Structure formats: C-alpha cells, structure tokens
C-alpha cells in the first residue's frame, strides 16, 4: 500500500516528536503492509515549510529503514494567500514527491466564496489539488456540493483511514461511507501523527472498504491511485460523479458513466 499523507518526520510540526518515534511509526507502517510513504508536514503560519530540513529529516529516517519502506516528501498545504503566491513560481516545492499532486487542507471555520478561483489558480500554476479529509470538515459536510464543484474542475478527494473506522466520530464516518458508496473518493490515507491516536496504519480500513465496495475499489484507493500520485501519473481510477452533484445552476446534468480500471 502507498500512504500519501502522514506526519512522520520529527520536529517539523505536530507529528512525530522524535527520530525514535518516527522510526517506530515507519516500522508500524511496514508491519501493516505499507511500502511507500509520503511525509507531508504542515505548511501554515504555525509551522513554516522548510524544504531543506524536511529532506534532511527524511534522509535520516530513510537510512534507518534498511530499504523496507520508501520515503518521499510533500506537504499538507494550507490555503493562505502567502502559500499560494509562494507556490506560483515553483509548485513542486510543495507537491507530493515533487511531481504534480498537491494535498490541500481547508479551514474548519471559513471557506470563502472565492475558493473555486483559488483552486483554479493552483491548477494554472501546475498543481493538481487533492482535497484532504473533507469528511472531517464540518463546513464541507454541511455543503458537500461545493466539493463536488471542485471535483468537476479537476480536484480529487482523500479521506482518512481512521474516519472509515469511526475514530473521528460518527458524522465523519457516515460521510466517508456515503462518499465511498457513491464513488466520490480517490484516495484513503493515514494522516498519521503518532503511534497511538493517529497511527500509520491502513490495513483495517482497506479491509472495510473491500467488504463494502469490493476488492478492486480497495486496491484503487490504497494502491493504484496513491502509487500514481507518488509517480506523478494520471489516476487510473476516477469514477464519474453522480448526476446533478456539483453542477452549475441551470446546467444540463451529465449522464452517469461507469468507472474503469486500467
């Protein structure tokens, strides 16, 4: 499995608090069947994004893993004016594995009406947004049609493995399961921060997804799409949005198409 969102690198944000904890998180991932991890520290006003320090911490951790886990870097990108402007000349500074996909996190308290345009700007600058853990965001849960519009303009969706297991509350779980059933999700990731409450594990969530919607979809969400993002390739699994979701007012609904696997 491939995890595209975790906070495994120590001393950079609210994730691992030491190199020893980071190594134990990596060992937890290996035991869980994870082969590739993208370390994605926060990039916000509280935690400045420091690419050189991030690479140094990645290399230090990688040297302890005996080739059992491949580590890459990216970031958990907060949509501030400063971040968007800094991304403009060099989007790969922030993208996953310095390719094309960008994890984008929304504020839980306010999502301005201009967000459609901001996401479009990111795309014009060369980044493909992946909306992180929207099932945990009360504003998106209350008005998911906004997210569907972003999907229609080329954004993708990542939910947290622990949400599917009910560990972020019933509302997040119900939303994640609904989107899973409707083909709204493109990735499941750990968003791991530590060894206990936010572990670097995916296996249990994968088994639940396989039980609910089948092994092929589980493989797409935990392996095929994440590996494509890791490599900077087009995603092989992109279901068509259900009719009417995210349509502009007055638009003619699109016919529902079946999704496919390559």
Give the ranges of each region predicted by the language model.
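An N-terminally biased module of ancient metal coordination in phosphate/nucleic-acid-related enzymes
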Residues: 1-68
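Active-site neighborhood of phospho(di)ester-bond hydrolases with catalytic His/Asp-centered motifs
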Residues: 2-4, 37-40, 72-76, 130-132, ...
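Non-catalytic positions within long, well-ordered alpha-helices that form the structural scaffold/packing
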Residues: 30, 123, 180-181
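Active-site environment of divalent metal-dependent phosphoester hydrolases
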Residues: 44-47, 78-80, 136-140, 164-167, ...
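Short acidic, glycine/proline-enriched helix-loop-strand junctions
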Residues: 48-56, 65-70, 197-223
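Extended substrate/RNA-proximal surfaces in nucleic-acid metabolism proteins
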Residues: 50-158, 236, 241-262
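C-terminal helical cap
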Residues: 167-169, 215-243
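Short acidic/histidine-rich active-site segments
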Residues: 184-200
């Amino acid at each position: 499995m491939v995890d595209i969102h975790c906070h495994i690198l120590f001393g950079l944000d609210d994730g691992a608090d030491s190199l020893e904890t980071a190594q134990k998180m990596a060992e937890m991932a290996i035991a869980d069947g994870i082969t590739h991890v993208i370390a994605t520290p926060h990039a916000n006003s509280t935690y400045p994004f420091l690419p050189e320090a991030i690479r140094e911490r990645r290399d230090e951790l990688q040297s302890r893993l005996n080739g059992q886990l491949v580590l890459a870097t990216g970031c958990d990108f907060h949509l501030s004016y400063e971040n968007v402007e800094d991304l403009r000349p060099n989007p790969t500074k922030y993208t996953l594995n310095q390719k094309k996909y960008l994890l984008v996190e929304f504020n839980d308290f306010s999502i301005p009406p201009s967000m459609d345009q901001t996401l479009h700007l990111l795309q014009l600058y060369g980044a493909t947004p992946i909306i992180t853990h929207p099932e945990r965001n009360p504003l998106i849960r209350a008005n998911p049609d906004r997210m569907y519009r972003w999907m229609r303009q080329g954004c993708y969706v990542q939910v947290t493995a622990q949400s599917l297991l009910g560990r972020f509350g019933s509302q997040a779980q119900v939303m994640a399961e609904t989107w899973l059933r409707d083909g709204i999700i493109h990735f499941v990731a750990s968003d791991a921060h530590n060894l206990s409450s936010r572990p670097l594990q995916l296996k249990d969530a994968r088994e639940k997804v396989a039980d609910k919607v089948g092994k092929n979809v589980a493989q797409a969400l935990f392996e095929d799409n994440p590996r494509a993002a890791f490599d900077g390739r087009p995603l092989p699994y992109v279901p068509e949005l259900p009719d009417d979701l995210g349509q502009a007012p007055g638009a003619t609904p699109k016919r529902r198409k079946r999704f496919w696997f390559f």
